[in-house]
Amino acid sequence: MSNQHTLLISNLLPVGSNISTWWNFGSMLLTCMALQTSTGFFLAIHYTANINLAFSSVTHILRDVPYGWIMQNLHAIGASLFFICIYTHIARGLYYGLYLNKWVWLSGTILLIILMATAFFGYVLPWGQMSFWAATVITNLLTAIPYLGPTLTTWLWGGFSINDPTLTRFFALHFILPFLIISLSSIHIVLLHNEGSNNPLGTNPDIDKIPFHPYHSYKDMLMATTMITMLFITMSFMPNLFNDPENFSKANPLVTPQHIKPEWYFLFAYGILRSIPNKLGGTLALLMSVIILTAPPFTHTSHVRPMTFRPLTQILFWMLIATFITITWTATKPVEPPFITISQMASTXYFLFFIINPILGWIENKIINK
């Protein structure tokens, strides 16, 4: 164990004095993970992974179990809060060039993929209409894989359609994957403290450092408290803010919802999938929407690390954020004009960010050298 890890345990780890609030989202994600694991455990005690009883067991938790409604709402809204924090965490990494710490960034991307899989499995568990049909549509994408597709789909379903074995294995995966996420998170943190965190200026942080405790630990506590307060306000006054009305009806394989869509935090990937009128092409675009995050560490060309002093790249970054929001919005709409065109244009602009960013870095280098 290195000296830095010893300091980390005793809370004396030296940290750059100028790291901003954007650096608090890592600890907020840790808080979210603790909340999701604890509430998930209590929900698992009362949940029944059976297609005839799953929907009733969720209703039972909400109505009959003491404080069950708090557990269920905390878990459901907590998932949305988790993704708000993680998307902000990723955006911060892109803006400040933190992806140059390659292994931290790549381990984070793997964490994101596993987290998305875990959230998807969890969305299926209540066995409501939207849960069932979202699972049908997304798992069906496996059939787009040449030769192996149909076999893989049958293997995942545990039969020739989504049924009891599918729900059982999804519950098992949703229960076990968070422990893998916790393990990988610890690796992510160890890798981060191996090189140390960067700062908003992108300068050498060794020049001016202060102890992590009490300065940054109190800042972490403030942000975590603010986040939990927001969570409880949402749970108390708007518990169904992120829920789909279709999911209040039990899953019916004979009735298709008018508009099938996953949870809001997957809409950007779902929008990219829908924008391509080809099953295999759409599936590849869906995968690439997340996997492309592994590209920036290898395509960074600028001599300056953060976007703080790069106005051209800043414009491109905020275009990416606007594009992300636009794709999310179009994915909530029916597949008809003008939403198809908007979705296709926004999806193209999303991928263009990762191509134009290194070119802009090279142009900025030329301007600086002049």
Swiss-Prot record:
Where is heme b b566 bound in this sequence? H89, H188
Biological process according to GO: mitochondrial electron transport, ubiquinol to cytochrome c
Q: Its membrane topology, per UniProt?
A: Multi-pass membrane protein
Q: Which Pfam families match?
A: Cytochrom_B_C, Cytochrome_B
Q: Where are the transmembrane segments?
A: 25-45, 69-90, 105-125, 170-190, 218-238, 280-300, 312-332, 339-358
Q: Which positions does UniProt annotate for a ubiquinone binding?
A: H193
GO cellular component annotations of the record? mitochondrial inner membrane; respiratory chain complex III
What is written in the cofactor note of this entry? Answer: Binds 2 heme b groups non-covalently.
Q: Which cofactor does it need?
A: heme b
Q: Where's it mainly located?
A: mitochondrion
Which molecular function terms from Gene Ontology are attached? metal ion binding; ubiquinol-cytochrome-c reductase activity
Binding positions for heme b b562 per the UniProt entry: H75, H174
Q: Does the keyword Repressor apply?
A: no
Protein family: Belongs to the cytochrome b family.
General remark? Heme 1 (or BL or b562) is low-potential and absorbs at about 562 nm, and heme 2 (or BH or b566) is high-potential and absorbs at about 566 nm.
Subunit-structure text: The cytochrome bc1 complex contains 3 respiratory subunits (MT-CYB, CYC1 and UQCRFS1), 2 core proteins (UQCRC1 and UQCRC2) and probably 6 low-molecular weight proteins.
Specify the protein name.
Answer: Cytochrome b
